[in-house]
């Protein structure tokens, strides 16, 4: 993953040293927002032998692609089922790193998530009956702040829709996905956001 990122950045005219320095500006926001995730990344760094500041570059990456999300509740399904659907339109070079991750964190709901190398949590569902997916948005107000992949982990730790919506609209976020939050009851919301603004769409 790191080697792929180095090659991609080099082609875009950004040196690896510059990328590491830029990502470092986000670190204190990330640590304040989710210290448990930072601790997890530290353990990942220790076990993989990849320096933490280099791993962190991957979590501050710009838009990776343009995914598609669909949410359906009982009003639109023949048997009353609720569906939360996501296509992961990823860079081909990184597709081999996509894995399903089953997590049972202490004090938080257990979850099943799509991840990149078990580190970046992309979308998933948890034992509280919540799911979230997200797709990339073009936005013109990106800034130094909490990386949106940190929001993804906290979304999976949410126990209620209101808690998940609070996470999705974190005021110090660096940027945002189009975040789709769904509950097993059929309640669903789309939070279409950027770094400094968002629109809330209720899926009736």
Q: Where on the chain are the PLM-derived regions?
A:
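N-terminal nucleophile
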Residues: 1-204
């Amino acid at each position: 993953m790191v080697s792929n990122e180095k090659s991609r950045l080099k082609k875009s005219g950004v040196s690896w040293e510059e990328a590491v320095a830029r990502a470092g500006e986000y670190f204190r926001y990330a640590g304040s927002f989710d210290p448990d995730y930072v601790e997890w990344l530290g353990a990942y760094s220790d076990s993989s032998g990849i320096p933490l500041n280099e791993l962190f570059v991957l979590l501050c990456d710009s838009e990776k692609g343009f995914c598609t999300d669909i949410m359906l509740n009982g009003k639109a399904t023949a048997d009353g089922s609720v569906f939360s659907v996501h296509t992961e339109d990823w860079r081909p070079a990184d597709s081999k790193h996509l894995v399903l991750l089953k997590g049972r964190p202490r004090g938080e709901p257990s979850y099943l998530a799509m991840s990149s190398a078990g580190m970046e949590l992309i979308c998933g569902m948890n034992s509280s009956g919540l799911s979230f997916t997200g797709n990339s948005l073009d936005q013109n107000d990106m800034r130094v702040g909490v990386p949106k992949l940190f929001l993804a982990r906290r979304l999976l730790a949410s126990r209620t829709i209101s808690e998940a919506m609070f996470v999705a609209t974190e005021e110090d976020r660096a940027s945002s996905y189009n975040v789709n939050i769904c509950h097993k009851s059929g309640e669903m919301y789309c939070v279409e956001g950027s770094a400094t603004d968002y629109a809330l769409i209720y899926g009736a």
